[in-house]
C-alpha cells in the first residue's frame, strides 16, 4: 500500500475526550496512517494542553494546528482538506475529536483496500449493522426521517447525513468545490448533497456511535428547519444551490498555525 493517508481530527473544547480519541490510534490503525493532524478551532478549555502533553509523552507523529480564528467545524474541514492537497496526500480520514466514533470501525475498509474503489467512504450510524449507544430515541427517529427525505430528493439511498467518521479521496477535493459551503455544522450535509450532484462514487459503511460526556452543539428544531430549507433549495435547482455562496462570512483563506 503506497497511498499517503492523512488522519484529520477536528477539535473544539474536547478536553474530556481528546486523549481517548488519540488512544484510538493503535498499532493496527497506525499501519495505514501516514500522518495525523489535530486541528483546534480556538478551544477555550484545556484541549490544546491535553494534545501537547500527549505528543510530548506518547506520540510525536501528531501535529497540532490551531486556526487563526474560530472557523467552526466546516472551516476546520477546509483547513484540513487544503493541508491534504498541498502536502500531496491521496486520502484523508476525518475523525471527530469528541470520541463518539470509533476509528477501528474503518479497519476493514483499510485492510481490504475498499476505499480505493470510492471517492467517499462515509460512516453510517443508521444501517442495519450499525451500533448506537446512549443515543436518544427522538434523535434516532429524527435521523431516520431525514435520511428518508434526503433519499427521496437525491433518488439514492441515504444512510447518514453526516457522521464524525469519514474518508475522502483527495483527488475530488483539489478543485475546492466545498469552499463556499457553510462553515457551520451543515458542512457535512452539503458535502453529502455535493457527492450526489457531482456523481462521486460513494460508499456508506456501518459504524458504532456513542454518547457519553459529549456536549452537543446541535439544536434539533433549528437544525431540522435548516435541513428542510437545504433540501428545498437543492430540489428546486441543484446546480444553482451547490455552486452558490452559503457562508455567512466569506473567508478567502482559512489560515492555521502549526504549534508542534
Task: Give residue ranges: language-model regions.
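Cell-envelope/extracellular polymer assembly enzymes that use nucleotide-activated donors
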Residues: 4-6, 35, 190
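A conserved acidic beta->alpha catalytic loop
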Residues: 40-49, 99
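Acceptor/aglycone-binding surface of glycosyltransferases and processive sugar-polymer synthases
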Residues: 67-86, 91, 103-185, 212-222, ...
